Each structure stands twice: as structure tokens, then as C-alpha cells.
Amino acid sequence: METRAAENTAIFMCKCCNLFSPNQSELLSHVSEKHMEEGVNVDEIIIPLRPLSTPEPPNSSKTGDEFLVMKRKRGRPKGSTKKSSTEEELAENIVSPTEDSPLAPEEGNSLPPSSLECSKCCRKFSNTRQLRKHICIIVLNLGEEEGEAGNESDLELEKKCKEDDREKASKRPRSQKTEKVQKISGKEARQLSGAKKPIISVVLTAHEAIPGATKIVPVEAGPPETGATNSETTSADLVPRRGYQEYAIQQTPYEQPMKSSRLGPTQLKIFTCEYCNKVFKFKHSLQAHLRIHTNEKPYKCPQCSYASAIKANLNVHLRKHTGEKFACDYCSFTCLSKGHLKVHIERVHKKIKQHCRFCKKKYSDVKNLIKHIRDAHDPQDKKVKEALDELCLMTREGKRQLLYDCHICERKFKNELDRDRHMLVHGDKWPFACELCGHGATKYQALELHVRKHPFVYVCAVCRKKFVSSIRLRTHIKEVHGAAQEALVFTSSINQSFCLLEPGGDIQQEALGDQLQLVEEEFALQGVNALKEEACPGDTQLEEGRKEPEAPGEMPAPAVHLASPQAESTALPPCELETTVVSSSDLHSQEVVSDDFLLKNDTSSAEAHAAPEKPPDMQHRSSVQTQGEVITLLLSKAQSAGSDQESHGAQSPLGEGQNMAVLSAGDPDPSRCLRSNPAEASDLLPPVAGGGDTITHQPDSCKAAPEHRSGITAFMKVLNSLQKKQMNTSLCERIRKVYGDLECEYCGKLFWYQVHFDMHVRTHTREHLYYCSQCHYSSITKNCLKRHVIQKHSNILLKCPTDGCDYSTPDKYKLQAHLKVHTALDKRSYSCPVCEKSFSEDRLIKSHIKTNHPEVSMSTISEVLGRRVQLKGLIGKRAMKCPYCDFYFMKNGSDLQRHIWAHEGVKPFKCSLCEYATRSKSNLKAHMNRHSTEKTHLCDMCGKKFKSKGTLKSHKLLHTADGKQFKCTVCDYTAAQKPQLLRHMEQHVSFKPFRCAHCHYSCNISGSLKRHYNRKHPNEEYANVGTGELAAEVLIQQGGLKCPVCSFVYGTKWEFNRHLKNKHGLKVVEIDGDPKWETATEAPEEPSTQYLHITEAEEDVQGTQAAVAALQDLRYTSESGDRLDPTAVNILQQIIELGAETHDATALASVVAMAPGTVTVVKQVTEEEPSSNHTVMIQETVQQASVELAEQHHLVVSSDDVEGIETVTVYTQGGEASEFIVYVQEAMQPVEEQAVEQPAQEL
């Protein structure tokens, strides 16, 4: 041993435990303590490790990473022993150790870590053995040359398999590693002499060997020609690189709209590596590949210093510490990877070989065969090239550059499975289609997950068709069943609709508890009655079925029979029960399918639905499954017809309890028992023509039950498996009160605010309003665009605040998820209650249960996570009830807080300059503008400045074409907003009930007077010294408008109409000359106008008398005989003759009932020349107005000679002289004690 130590020994190693030491005495003491009991010689355990010797000592520039890969001698080689010139040159230039001193197995450990790095791709290795087997260093494996790999050891097979699964590292240019001197062949020197040329584009070419496939071919940039180009490239290199390039392949849009509301992706993204120009279809594969170039190894072993760039490799490594291995069933081979075991069985035991088509050689894997064909055969040959293309598709590298095409729409897909699923889109029917929204799925599991997203199923009470939202249900009723009885049909349909959410789901038990309790009690009562009548004999049951139910909630159960003998003996899942109301004459010609939803229990369908055959006389009796939990009630066609014929005329045929239901006898929750209630629809259907008997008919679906049940759609299978709650109108109103009344037509989701609703609808319509200015990205919301710009086009990185953690990301949500790793709370593990699989994060187990175990309830998930979990977003955002009243507000919203402050009398936002206080921060900000003289908002069109942004926005409307759309009918004033016009109309009013006590200011509303006090008399107390309430006669004379319901007084008809609509919900409608008050169900901006035409009589006097009588009827219409205010009601304006003589009636025109604020065109009836001065005066005025005045101008003509008429106002409307507008103002009799002369006023 001393002799061995004398020969330039640098380090000693313990062979048993791989312990190294430069001192031999330390190892001797170690062996004596640890390994003496093993009975081995010390010289055999301690071995010296000598440094590598070099044949060229003067050359000091050689580094330790240049090794000779020793060829393994396994006997006489087969075939030619001729070696390629490249291999000979490389072997000559690689330093070889002395032949008399063979390398020890672990001698690479004596080298520094920097020497265990590949000089070509800069990849580092932990020992010399791995470096020798690296693909950049190895010259040629003798086993591959021989074409046989069956004699290799298992360890070598594992390493080779590992190399097959790992992507090959790219070759770095020599210019990046100038400190290393390498002696390589001239061919490889030319390959590595320059950097990789950047990819400038990607070309898609049709694959020659595979039809329907496209190959991605990257196009590299050409060599630089001028110095300017070089300078540009150099400046571009200074910009930090992402490491990859992203390319978007535009997808061909669909020619026809898809059945689903969601559109397919418009782009297909692929990626290329900037270091080695490899093409990747998936970004996660690219990110794992980039870690090879960046030497990033984020996955570290907690028990040793091992680190890897791929998480799967770390999982394999951890099995070294846990001892978990995969064992071969045929031999004693064990390995850490399941894939390695599979390769071992194929190579060693199954003897699977890859044969060359052009020679007799065989290879153990496809990669070696491809290498052989490229080296030994001509790749330019057509047959060789086709064989290479076919073999490349069997490798991961070959599939990486392949896309799959749809031959119909030319859309492209990244894998063949997606393409095959897409082909179903072009078929007549989707294999897994949602019947509510038209969404199509290619897998049953995907359809099942999709249907669970629909909170409600709305069912038409007439045709039993299902809809996803009440909007589509209402539209369907209008278009198909007519709008005559729309309200009744819609109400009945709501009562037969269902909620698909289970208890504890998205519906609040607190908010909807009362309604849900009523529904559950109703179902419980129905279930008890059904079970009682089910146990009765068939004859008694038929007799009882003819009786009227004693209570509204009681629904007698019908007789039950089995549809067919095949259904009796075959176990089948529950099917759709169908009910149609038709006439007996159309019994065989009209069949409308309708579906009842049945609750599918967890019990076996064979036990629940299968029954032994019964004789015909026993089929009318019910089949009660005493041991099962599900009782299915089926109504036969013959019995339903017979029962209806016997009871016809006594009661409604559908109101006799002939309902179909599925009752769960063992279910403690009676609300889960569902029923169909067509009784409510019986009154909604029109009577049958011809007096035929109306019966309940069951179509052929139940007559041929086995065929129908076997052909049940996937959607109905999913729907039958879900728990349901039947809805009613009160529950529906309660839900909308909690979640909002804005309903999405496409998915049925509810919203409170219009802005949120509009944003959500764009997710269905795919309307992108926000576009990125730096790329082709577009988004639905502004926040998504902002997030995109931060992540993609900015260098902002958010770093983890934890000490010692270098994690950084541009996405704040990813940072929040990362921070959970450092918290002790989230380090707990969660176990799945079904498969007992463990997860480290709560989001992972929730996603796992949702995907694999959708039947698990929310309460079970809440128990697993230790906190309450709810399904969010299915219906919408919940509202919270005010603790002081019954109003609902958005949860955690500012409206709720302000509302509570209003109850408590709190105004937290106070002005620091005065005593003003408010509950809104925005109101305080607007108030502070009064104390400031600075105007910071500038109009860019006229230069005018304003204090607030809202005022500037209103001002800019004046510069638009249709900005001033509110026009005064008295003068030429126009306003951009309606409140401004209402404020302007105050100056045209003679009676103003609000008056200032300190000046002559008066107004029509209290708000204007308060504003006047704040601006003109800020130190005075508000006081109204107006006349207040006056008598009806005084109000009529002064032109004021007094509400006939309450005591409020208004000076304008606009304020009066708004008061009626807001306070009393009323509007005035003239019907046949009789003014009536009606409830204002709809309040449009402009009241409707009704027309009353008085035809000219044979004698002119009769026509004049009829017109005057119609006017007088309006003045005295109340039963008490009191005169009504002519402007308080909707006055019937008439154009009557202005003279008492008979010839004055020749100018009689249409009589029009005009609502306040409307514009009506009256066409002149006659053009005869009247002799009355008054008539001539009006006609001349009309002619003058039509010629000289423009649109919306008017003239006021007054005459003191006409009794009962004070003023006539003529408006022009267009260029034709025969079209004008006339307002007639009656002359008011002056009050005796108060003779005030009133000016002409327009109504």
C-alpha cells in the first residue's frame, strides 16, 4: 500500500462508503472503526486515486474536460472495421491517458466541478461516467455499430433510456466559450464556428408522408452582408432576450355559427428556442427546455444536493431515498422509473428490435435505427427519405414539429386527438351536446361538468322544451305559443322549472330559507299523499282520482302500470316521462314530446325499476318496491284516456291529479322529490276546435320504452343524475332579489349592475373592445388588457418578500399563490374522501374533486378543508340584507354601508371648511369644488374650463351634432341634458309656489330655492314664503297643477307627470273622450297619444255642435260635477270653428288627444275660402308659418271676439303647408275678487 501511495497519489478513497481523504492515516482509522467487523482486507477497501497524466506536458492550455471515450471491446466486431474520418480526427485530438493505468470507476470525482462540463453545450455532470456517455462527447457506441444491444447491462439500458427521454441539449457557439481551447474535426469546427442564426419566420408545409398533417419549418436569417446589418444585430443583442420567440397561426373562422355560444380559438401559438432554434408546440415544454440553456435547476432534493430542471426527474431521484423501486416480473431487474422498466421488458425479454428496411441490421430503439439509416444509406433517396420521415414520427422530436389539419375548415391542432374531436363539430349532431345552451362536448365527462354550471332549467309548460334562461323561455312563448296568454304561460312554466343546485350550494340558506322551507313542506305533503294513494287498490284509486283535491298542495297519484313487458323484465335507467295535451280528434296526428326530470338515486336501477311480469288484470295496480328507495309512477295511455273520459265535464282533465312523479321514500329531504305539474297549464291552452274531448296522451316514447330508454341522450342522462329543486314564482322573485334582476340570456347568470352585466355578455359574444397597441392581443375587459401589458410588455417583476427566496414574477396573482408556500398554514396535506389521494394545496384538491368526483357535496369538501366552501359564480354575486329593513345590497359594497349609515344617521365625510357632511366620498369631493376657484378640466374644442370632470363631459355634448337634443317648446332654448331643460321651463310658469324671503326670487321646486339660499344668502336660514297650497279655483286661474291624489302643487306639467309616475304610479289616458286614471305599468319618456276623430256632419252646425260638446264633456267629467283642471288631466285638444255661423265649420280638421310634450301633425281637411275673419286670420297665419318659419317655430294668434277661446298656437312641422300643429287654450273666467290678466300660455 505504501508503494502505491508513493506514485503521485493525491487522494485516497474508502471503497465501502465512498469517503475521500487526502490523508491515508485518517482512512485507516476510519476503516478500523467502521469496517473491521466485515472481515475484509484494508488494502482492498482503501484505494488510491491518481491524477490524470498528459502526454503533452508543455501544453498547459488543455483542460480536464477533454477525455478519451474508451471503446468497449466485446470480441470480434461484425462487419467492416472501417471508421469514419471524423471519428479518427476526433480521437487523435482528444487526450488519452496512459494505457498502463486504467481509469478507476470513480476517478472523475477527483476533478474539480468545472472540469465536468461539456465544452460544446456547457452541460455539467456530477461524475466522469456521465460525461463519457454524454452525446456530445461519445464517438460511436460499438454496440450500435454492431446493431445488437441485447447484451448490454441493465445499468447501461437505464442510462440509454434516460437519454432517449431527455431532450438533447443544444450546441452553443464557440464564441460564447472562448476561454476553452478545443481540438475537433474540421467539420464540427465549421458547425460551431458561428452562432445559431435567428429564426425570422415559420413556414407551414404539408407533410409528405402523412395526409392531413402539417410540418412546422423554421426559416433562419441569412448571413449578414453589410456592416450596418452587423451593427443592428449587435444593438439587438444588447436587449435582454426572453429565450424564445412566439408565433401565432391564424385559424380559419367558422363559416357558420357554432352551436355553442363560445367560439373556437382564433390563433394557434407555437414557440421556438432562441438558443438552438428548436420548435415547440407547448409553452410548458419550452420552459422546461430553456432551463438547459440557463442552467436553472429549481427542483432540489431536500435530502441531498441533487437538483434538476424537470420536476419528473426529481420525483425519480427521490425514490433513491425512499427505496421505492419498480421490479421486473421476469428477472431481478429493478429501477426507479416506470418508463425504464417498460423499455427493459421490451428490449431484454420481449426482444423487440427495430429492423432496417435496406439492410439486415437490427437495433434496440428507433433513435439508433434513424442514426444508422442516415449514416449508412443515402438520405436523398426517395425511399430512404420516406422511411426516415416515418421513423421520425415515432420519436418525440419528430412529433414536436407536426400539426394536424381539418380537411373541412382547414383549422390546425397540436395533437391528433384534438383534431379527431374537432371533426365531430362538422357532423349533424354533437355526441355530447347540452340541450340548454347548445354547447357541444366531445367527452361525456366534459358534458357532465358543463351541465353542472347551469343553475336553473326553465321548462315550457306547453311543449315541455327546456331553456337556460327565462329570457329565452319568454321569447319562445311569444314566438311559438302566441302572446295572448303570455303572462299565464310564463308563470306556469316558472312553477314547473327546476333549480339544479344541491343544498349548501350557491343559494343562500339564510336569504332563501323561508321560500325553500315552503317548497320543502309542499313537496313533503305531496309525497305523503302520493304514497297513501299508491297503497290503495286500483279501483279505489281511480274513484278518488276523480275527486277535487282538498288542499291546493295535494296532488292525487295516478294509477300505475308498466309500459311494456320488455320494460318489466329489463333493468333500465329512469326515462323521460312525456305528457301532451291534445284533442281526441288529433290523437294520432299530433304528438308533442315533453320531458319530466326524474331524480336518479344511488340505488341500483335494476332494483328500482325492474319488476316481474304481471297478468293483465293486475297491471292497473301500482308496483311498490318495498325494499327500494325509488318509486316510479307511470301513467298508461289507456287508463289516462279512460279516466279523463269518465270525468270529462266535471273538472279540468289535467287537474285530476294525473301527474307523474318520482318519490324518494327513503330520502329525508322531501324537497328532492320532483314532480311535473301540468295542471296549471290546462287553463292556459286554447279550447279544442270541434268540441273534442281533451285527454292526457302519452306518446310513443313510453309505449316503446326499451327503445327510447336505450336511445336517451347524454344530456338527459346527466340531468337525471343531478339533484333538483322545483321552483315557483315566489322563490324565483326571492332569488332575483338576492342576486339581481339582470339576467344573462346565454347562461342564466344574474347581475346587480349594468356594467357588470355588459362585461359578462361580451364573454359570450366574444366582443373584444380593448386592443393592445404593441401586439395583436385583444381582451373583453380593460383590466385584462392592463394585466397583459404589465406581463408581456414591461420589465416589472414582483419579487417574493421572503428572505432567501429569489422568486419573481410579473403577475401579482402568481406571487400570491407563491407566498402560500412560505406560510405554515398551507403546508398541511388534504386527503380526497373518495380515492384518498393527498394534496398539498386546497385549490388542488378542489380541482381534483370537481374533475374526478363531481358527486361529492359541498359540505363534504368543507369538512375536508376545514372551512366553508361554496360554489361561486353559478348564479351571480350574492346580496346582503339590510339589518334595519328588507332592502338588499351587494355584499361588501359601498351602497350597503351608505344605506346603513342612513338608518343610523351617520355622515362620516365632513367638509373641513364648512359644516357640510355627507355619506358619499364623491359628494364631498364635488362639494369641495365650491370652495375652490381652480378649474383644471379644459375643453379641447373651445378652451372653456370647468371644475369637475362630469361638468366637462356634459359640456362636450354641446359640440356634438345631436348634443342639444332637449328643446323648449315655448322658446328657442336647447339643452344637452333633461334636468337643464326642466330648470329652464320654470321661467315660462306663471305660478311658482316657492319664493325667497329676502329677495324677489321664486321657483317651482324646492331644490332650486335651496340652491338659491346657498349661493345668494349663505348666512340666512332656509324659508319658503310662497303662497303654499291654494284652492282648486285659484290654482286653475294661476296656471298651477295640483295633484288630484295628494296636496302637492306643481308649476309645470313635466313636474306634474313625473310626480304622478314616481309617487302614485299613475298616468292619464283618454279613452273615447273620458279621462281615466290607469296604473303606469310602463313609463316611457314620451306619453302615448290617442286620436279621436270627429267626422263632419251633413250640416255644418251639427259638426260644430259635436266638437263643442266633446270639449265641454272634458271640462265636467267627474260624478260630483266639479270642474277638473284642464291641465291636470290629459286635455282633449280640438280644432273647432272660430265662428258661430254655419260656413265657419268648413275648416274643421281632425280632433286630436294630445299628451303633454308630444308633437302631433294635423292635416288640413278643406281648402275652401272661408268668409269669417277669424278663419281667414288662422289660414293666413298657417300659410305664413309654413313659408317663413323654420321647423319648430310657432306663432301665437289671439282674438277677443271668439267666445271660449283665448289663444291658438300654431306650430310648423316640415315644409308642407298642409301640415301644422295647433294648440287651443280655453279662456278662463276671472275670479270676482282677483281679476288678474293672464298672458297667453301654451299647454
From Swiss-Prot:
Zn(2+) 7 binds at residues 772, 775, 788, 793. Zn(2+) 9 binds at residues 832, 835, 848, 853. Signal peptide: none annotated. One of its GO terms (biological process) is hematopoietic progenitor cell differentiation. Zn(2+) 10 binds at residues 882, 885, 899, 903. This is Zinc finger protein ZFAT. InterPro entries: Zinc_finger/UBP_domain (IPR050688), Znf_C2H2_sf (IPR036236), Znf_C2H2_type (IPR013087). May be involved in transcriptional regulation. Overexpression causes down-regulation of a number of genes involved in the immune response. Some genes are also up-regulated. Zn(2+) 11 binds at residues 911, 914, 927, 931. Zn(2+) 5 binds at residues 406, 409, 422, 426. Pfam families: zf-C2H2 (PF00096), zf-H2C2_5 (PF13909). Changing residue 400 to Q: Found in a patient with global developmental delay; uncertain significance. Zn(2+) 3 binds at residues 328, 331, 344, 349. Zn(2+) 12 binds at residues 939, 942, 955, 958. Residues 51-116, 147-189, 534-570, 603-625, 638-705 are annotated as: Disordered. The gene is ZFAT. PROSITE patterns: ZINC_FINGER_C2H2_1 (PS00028), ZINC_FINGER_C2H2_2 (PS50157). Zn(2+) 4 binds at residues 356, 359, 372, 377.
